[in-house]
């Protein structure tokens, strides 16, 4: 398995969960992963020119990957769209979208056989909640990126998944700084912290890995909310309620 952004948060959770399953784990991140047994290379995905060489160093000799998880991403600031600069939006797009294009292109060019590619997306990609700006736009673009590449990976299943709320460093910001009165979506997030609705990174990673094979029941290139797999009735009711608004 190959994971991006594996030094902390969900990416580190995936690495730990995969190692516990006895899998061979490859990863890249800016800071490096501290878990023993991970084949790791430091790589700033925002520095596009350096990414192919880092991947070649990491995956030299690897002929097949059962699973690639495109996890690396940034949130940006929660604030009005009017106050969000093109530079900020560009940074979100660079990390959350275009770095993944570079990785996907490299996998095609290098000829490594890949069974499944999963991009870590978000409900923000479809909800359009106030203040989420570059994060929402870039995750929506990631969903479409994977849909488009599904035509170019005929022997690989691609999907974007919204993994649900996860208690990572991102939540330290979301649960403290932005005003939930101004940005209503934060109310649900803050109420969920400390409950089973918001597991830690390792538990969240385990939850995704338990259902990752079932993503193949959807068309390649699909966007899937994890609740469609673990709580389909709850998800259907939620979507129905939103449509009535």
Residue ranges and their predicted role:
Residues 4, 65-73, 96, 119, ...:
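Rossmann-fold scaffold of SDR-type NAD(P)-dependent oxidoreductases
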Residues 7-11, 15:
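N-terminal Rossmann NAD(P)H-binding glycine-rich loop of SDR-like oxidoreductase domains
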Residues 36-49:
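Rossmann-fold cofactor-recognition segment
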Residues 73-90, 131:
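Conserved mid-core segment of classical short-chain dehydrogenase/reductases
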Residues 82-101, 142:
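Catalytic Tyr-X3-Lys loop
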Residues 93-100, 130, 138, 197:
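Short alpha-helix in the Rossmann-fold core of NAD(P)-dependent oxidoreductases
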Residues 116-141, 146-154, 162-166, 172-175:
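Catalytic loop of short-chain dehydrogenase/reductase
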Residues 160, 179-239:
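C-terminal helical subdomain
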């Amino acid at each position: 398995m190959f994971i991006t952004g594996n030094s902390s948060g969900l990416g580190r959770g995936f690495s730990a969960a995969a190692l516990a399953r006895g899998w061979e784990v490859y990863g890249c991140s800016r800071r490096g992963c501290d878990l023993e047994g991970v084949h790791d290379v430091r790589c700033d995905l925002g520095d596009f020119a350096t990414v192919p060489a880092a991947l070649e160093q990491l995956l030299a000799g690897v002929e097949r990957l059962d699973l690639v998880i495109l996890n690396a991403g940034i949130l940006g600031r929660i604030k009005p769209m009017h106050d969000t600069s093109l530079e900020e939006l560009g940074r979100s797009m660079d990390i959350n979208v275009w770095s993944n294009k570079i990785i996907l292109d490299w996998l095609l060019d290098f000829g490594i056989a890949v069974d499944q590619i999963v991009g870590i997306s978000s409900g923000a990609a479809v909800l359009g909640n106030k203040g989420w700006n570059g994060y929402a736009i870039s995750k929506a673009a990631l969903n479409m990126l994977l849909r488009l590449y599904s035509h170019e990976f005929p022997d690989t299943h691609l999907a974007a998944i919204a993994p649900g709320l996860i208690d990572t460093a991102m939540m330290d910001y979301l649960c403290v700084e932005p005003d939930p009165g101004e940005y209503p979506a934060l109310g649900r997030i803050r109420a969920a912290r400390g409950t089973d609705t918001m597991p830690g990174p390792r538990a969240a990673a385990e939850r995704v890995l338990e259902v990752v094979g079932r993503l193949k029941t959807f068309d390649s290139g699909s966007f899937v909310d994890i609740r469609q797999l673990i709580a389909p009735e709850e998800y259907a009711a939620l979507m129905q309620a939103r449509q009535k608004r």
